[in-house]
């Protein structure tokens, strides 16, 4: 068991890990190479560098630093977080991790496909959170748009109450093929309905009648996890206090998922605060 689990290994996540690990707490960082920092061509406004550095290099240096201190760094996709006596974080390929505190630091980006009707029916049959809205579709037909581990996890959540089909919008991934959940690999044309969603249309002319459409494309962001856990979210940012604590005890957030300014220096500072706050939380809990 890790005492602290950090989801996201960009500057906020790694910064948090430096503080939790140096405080003597077993720390696991889970993330993918799909951070905003990794895509930055040149960074020249960060303290301590006499020459500009590209985002990929700064990212790699952070990972090396975390590993040198003894952090457990896992390259994987987090698909769910559950709270029991401790927090249980499930990944796509490395199983489940348990921790006394969780720090969310995966950013807030969510890819929204350019599908006609998607925006129009948000809140009227289009949802981004299975655990939040599954109840409303009990014994109904629903679709999940997505083509990876996150889409499969959302579909399994819905399967307990509804008749679910995964729509991969193209060639299905192995995760989808092996999930045991019905899927269609047709290209999506639109989501249609009148006052609410009635179905999904495909480019080959076929249609699928459903009452709800759940969007689960790519990997889940901190905002996705926040909504599933009942964390306060305003203006697409997780609400935190001065200690980076959310409204849920033991869950902290740092970086782009809660910051008004998307800068490396802000992410690093918030990560440090979140890490120290997680240490304080666990010590007080024990």
Each predicted region: which residue ranges?
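FAD-binding core/adjacent interface of flavoenzyme oxidoreductases
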Residues: 1-7, 72-139, 214-216, 238-246
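Beta1-alpha1 glycine-rich phosphate/pyrophosphate-binding loop at the start
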Residues: 4-57, 65, 140-174
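Hydrophobic/aromatic ligand-binding patch that stacks against planar heteroaromatic rings
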Residues: 15, 19-20, 102, 157-158, ...
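A Rossmann-like FAD-binding core segment of flavoenzymes
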Residues: 37, 63-84, 89-91, 96-97, ...
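Short loop/helix-cap segments at secondary-structure boundaries that form the rim of catalytic
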Residues: 39-40, 114-119, 135-137, 158, ...
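FAD-site-proximal beta/loop scaffold in flavoenzymes
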Residues: 114, 120-135, 217-261, 266, ...
């Amino acid at each position: 068991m890790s005492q602290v689990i950090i989801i996201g290994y960009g500057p906020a996540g790694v910064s948090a890990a430096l503080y939790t690990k140096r405080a003597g707490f077993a720390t696991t960082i889970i993330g993918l190479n799909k951070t905003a920092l990794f895509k930055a061509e040149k960074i020249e406004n960060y303290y301590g560098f006499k020459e500009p550095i590209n985002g990929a290099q700064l990212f790699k240096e952070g990972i090396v630093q975390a590993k040198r201190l003894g952090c457990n760094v896992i390259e994987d996709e987090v698909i769910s977080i559950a709270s029991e006596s401790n927090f249980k974080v499930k990944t796509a390929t490395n199983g489940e991790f348990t921790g006394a505190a969780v720090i969310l630091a995966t950013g807030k980006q969510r890819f929204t496909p350019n599908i006609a009707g998607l925006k129009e029916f948000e809140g009227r049959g289009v949802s981004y959170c299975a655990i939040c809205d599954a109840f409303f579709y009990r014994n109904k037909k629903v679709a999940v748009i997505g083509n990876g581990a996150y889409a499969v996890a959302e579909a399994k959540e819905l399967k307990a109450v509804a008749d679910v089909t995964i729509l991969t919008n193209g060639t299905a991934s192995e995760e989808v093929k092996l999930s045991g959940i019905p899927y269609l690999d047709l290209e999506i044309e639109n989501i249609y309905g009148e006052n609410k969603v009635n179905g999904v249309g495909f480019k080959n002319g076929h249609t699928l009648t459903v009452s709800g459409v759940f969007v689960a494309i790519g990997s889940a962001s901190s905002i996705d996890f926040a909504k599933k856990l009942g964390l306060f979210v305003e203006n697409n940012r997780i609400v935190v206090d001065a200690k980076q604590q959310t409204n849920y005890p033991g869950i902290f957030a740092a970086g782009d998922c809660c910051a008004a300014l998307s800068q490396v220096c802000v992410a690093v500072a918030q990560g440090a605060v979140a890490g120290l706050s997680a240490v304080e939380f666990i010590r007080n809990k024990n």
